[in-house]
Regions:
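Short loop-beta-helix segment that forms the pyridoxal 5′-phosphate
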Residues: 158-164
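Short, hydrophobic/aromatic alpha-helical segments in well-folded domains
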Residues: 172-176
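Short conserved active-site loop signatures built around small residues
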Residues: 169
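Conserved "HGTGT" condensation-loop signature of ketosynthase/thiolase-family condensing enzymes
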Residues: 2-158, 178-181
Length: 183
C-alpha cells in the first residue's frame, strides 16, 4: 500500500497571553525558569464556599477599538485583541498578500463571550425578568471570537470556532491545516 505524503503546513510565531504573562518570550522564560511565586489566583468566586486555584490574566489589557459594536465587546475578545497585537503585522500582511476573501479565521475557544451574560442569568435565577438586564446573543455565540477578528482586520474569508474544551486549540490548528492543504 502506498501512502501519500501530505504537504507540510508551518505554524508561524504564535500570540500568547495567559496567567504567565504576555508574549512568547515571557512564556518560555516562565516555563524554563519558574519563579517562587505562583501565577495562579485563589478564589471562591466560581464555587460558593470553596476556594480553588485558577489562572487569570491580571495585567492591563489593550483597549478594544472605540468604534466596536456591543456585540464584540467581551473580556474574551479583549484578551484576544491584546494577544493579537503581538502578530498584528503578520495578520495584516496575510490579508494584503492573499486578499480579504482568501484569508480565514479558524480559532479554538471554550467560552466565547458567555461570561458577559452571567449578570442576566443570575438576575433571572434570583427571580428577575429577562428584559431587566442587557443581553447580547452575538457575544454568547461560539463564533464570537472569529467574527470579532474578521471584523477588526477586514477579513471576509471562511471563519469559525472549534470548541472541544481542552483540545479546542489543537483541533483548530488541525482544521486550519486541512483547509490550507485543500487549497
Amino acid at each position: 500500500r502506498r501512502t501519500m505524503m501530505k504537504p507540510p503546513v508551518y505554524l508561524s510565531r504564535p500570540a500568547v497571553t495567559s496567567a504567565l504573562g504576555n508574549g512568547l518570550r515571557t512564556h518560555i522564560d516562565a516555563l524554563l525558569m519558574p519563579s517562587e511565586t505562583s501565577p495562579l489566583t485563589f478564589s471562591d468566586q466560581w464555587v460558593k464556599g470553596k476556594t480553588f486555584a485558577f489562572g487569570a490574566v491580571n495585567e492591563t489589557l489593550r483597549p478594544l477599538p472605540d468604534n466596536l459594536s456591543a456585540a464584540h465587546r467581551s473580556r474574551n475578545n479583549q484578551l484576544l485583541w491584546h494577544a493579537l497585537e503581538q502578530i498584528e503585522d503578520d495578520i495584516r500582511a496575510a490579508v494584503r498578500r492573499y486578499g480579504a476573501a482568501r484569508t480565514a479565521v479558524i480559532m479554538g475557544t471554550s467560552t466565547s463571550g458567555a461570561d458577559e451574560n452571567i449578570p442576566l442569568f443570575q438576575h433571572v435565577a434570583d427571580g428577575g425578568g429577562w428584559a431587566d438586564k442587557p443581553f447580547n446573543q452575538l457575544q454568547h455565540e461560539m463564533a464570537s471570537p472569529s467574527e470579532f477578528v474578521a471584523h477588526v482586520y477586514g477579513i471576509h474569508g471562511l471563519r469559525y470556532v472549534v470548541s472541544t474544551a481542552c483540545t479546542s486549540g489543537a483541533r483548530a490548528l488541525i482544521s486550519a491545516a486541512r483547509l490550507l492543504r485543500s487549497g
